[in-house]
């Protein structure tokens, strides 16, 4: 008897949420020392790379569609976080750190897009 796809999706979401929290805790000293939201930046960039790779490999049929749902939507959907990025950006602006907010936004979008493209390119070659 196989698990229904929705159950794999839910399990993937649980794994992604736990991994994100572990990464946040691991990087908490860096964030506290610098005041820069490095944890969410790194989480989102890594997630962008892994999603680009996953979509390339499932799109080519190397991995089954269930992997896209379980890993792409479940794990990576829970691991990455646009809402936390947005609220951290807002917090920087509220504290009068406009330059840091601009750097955070530019790095998040620029590195995230670069990582997604790199994942897609790697997936096309595997």
UniProtKB/Swiss-Prot annotation:
It catalyses: fluoride(in) = fluoride(out). Pfam families: CRCB. This is Fluoride-specific ion channel FluC. The chain crosses the membrane at residues 7-27, 36-56, 74-94, 98-118. One of its GO terms (biological process) is fluoride transmembrane transport. Na(+) binds at residues 77, 80. Na(+) is not transported, but it plays an essential structural role and its presence is essential for fluoride channel function. Belongs to the fluoride channel Fluc/FEX (TC 1.A.43) family. The keyword Transferase does not apply.
């Amino acid at each position: 008897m196989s698990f229904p796809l929705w159950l794999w999706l839910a399990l993937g979401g649980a794994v992604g949420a736990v991994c994100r929290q572990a990464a946040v805790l691991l990087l908490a000293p860096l964030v506290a020392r610098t005041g820069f939201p490095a944890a969410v930046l790194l989480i989102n960039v890594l997630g962008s790379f892994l999603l680009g790779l996953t979509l390339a490999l499932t799109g080519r049929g190397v991995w089954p569609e269930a992997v896209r749902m379980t890993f792409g939507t479940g794990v990576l959907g829970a691991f990455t976080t646009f809402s936390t990025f947005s609220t951290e950006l807002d917090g920087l602006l509220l504290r009068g750190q406009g330059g840091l907010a601009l750097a955070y936004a530019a790095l998040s979008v620029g590195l995230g897009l670069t990582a997604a493209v790199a994942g897609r390119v790697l997936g096309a070659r595997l």
